[in-house]
């Protein structure tokens, strides 16, 4: 499951968790866009996810060429009984819209196969690709659950462009984001806007 490293909790799809539990599948949490996130907070999330049974976590940035390649070896470690021509390792990339699933797949395959863009819902259908004779990778459209339970999560998803612009009021989102930044990163705001007081 690809998550936005800037908002791992908000960008987790509860349906993915239910699906993994029901089918008893190993789960790799990929915190993408880690270059845009607070590294200390990202490390805390990695530690948290790694404590969950049958789950591993990694923080990456698809802008760094070698980082996506680590994912294949992690997937093999999660499913050691797979990875042969008779029992290929099947990996499915899932997540909410616009967290970088298709960009990640292109990086893993080292080809521009999947269409990418800075807006939700670029991928319209599943795309299946044979990496080699023992690995298969499937890219899926972004999946949103029927109702976002926590308003704060909705604001974070809107801020990171994970949901369509018709689903929220931009002014409300800007106010919420401003409040978050004032509380958590006041010094960065002062530096960014070259002010002494906020």
Range-by-range predicted roles:
Residues 6-27, 34, 40, 54-56, ...:
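Helix-rich effector regions associated with P-loop NTPase G domains
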Residues 14-18, 43-46, 72-74, 106-108, ...:
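Short, glycine/charged-enriched secondary-structure capping and boundary segments
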Residues 4, 49, 104, 139-140:
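Residue-level signature of catalytic and energy-coupling elements of molecular machines
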Residues 75-82, 108-112, 120, 135, ...:
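Short, well-ordered alpha-helical segments in soluble proteins
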Residues 25, 34-96, 113:
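Canonical P-loop GTPase G-domain recognition
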Residues 91-116, 140:
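Glycine-rich phosphate-binding P-loop
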Residues 1, 29-31, 93:
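Structural beta-sheet core signal
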């Amino acid at each position: 499951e690809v998550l936005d490293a800037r908002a791992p909790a908000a960008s987790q799809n509860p349906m993915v968790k239910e699906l993994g539990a029901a089918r008893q599948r190993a789960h790799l949490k990929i915190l993408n866009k880690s270059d845009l996130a607070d590294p200390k907070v990202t490390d805390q999330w990695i530690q948290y996810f790694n404590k969950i049974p049958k789950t591993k976590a990694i923080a990456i940035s698809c802008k760094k060429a070698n980082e996506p390649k680590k994912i294949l070896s992690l997937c093999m470690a999660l499913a050691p009984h797979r990875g042969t021509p008779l029992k290929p390792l099947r990996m499915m990339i899932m997540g909410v819209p616009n967290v970088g699933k298709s960009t990640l797949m292109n990086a893993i395959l080292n080809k521009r196969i999947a269409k990418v863009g800075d807006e939700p819902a670029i991928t319209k259908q599943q795309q299946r690709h044979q990496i080699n004779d023992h690995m298969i990778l499937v890219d899926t459209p972004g999946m949103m659950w029927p109702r976002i339970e926590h308003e704060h999560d909705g604001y974070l998803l809107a801020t990171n462009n994970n949901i369509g612009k018709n689903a929220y009021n931009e002014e409300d989102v800007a106010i919420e984001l401003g409040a978050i930044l004032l509380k958590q990163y006041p010094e960065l705001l002062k530096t960014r806007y070259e002010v002494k007081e906020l």
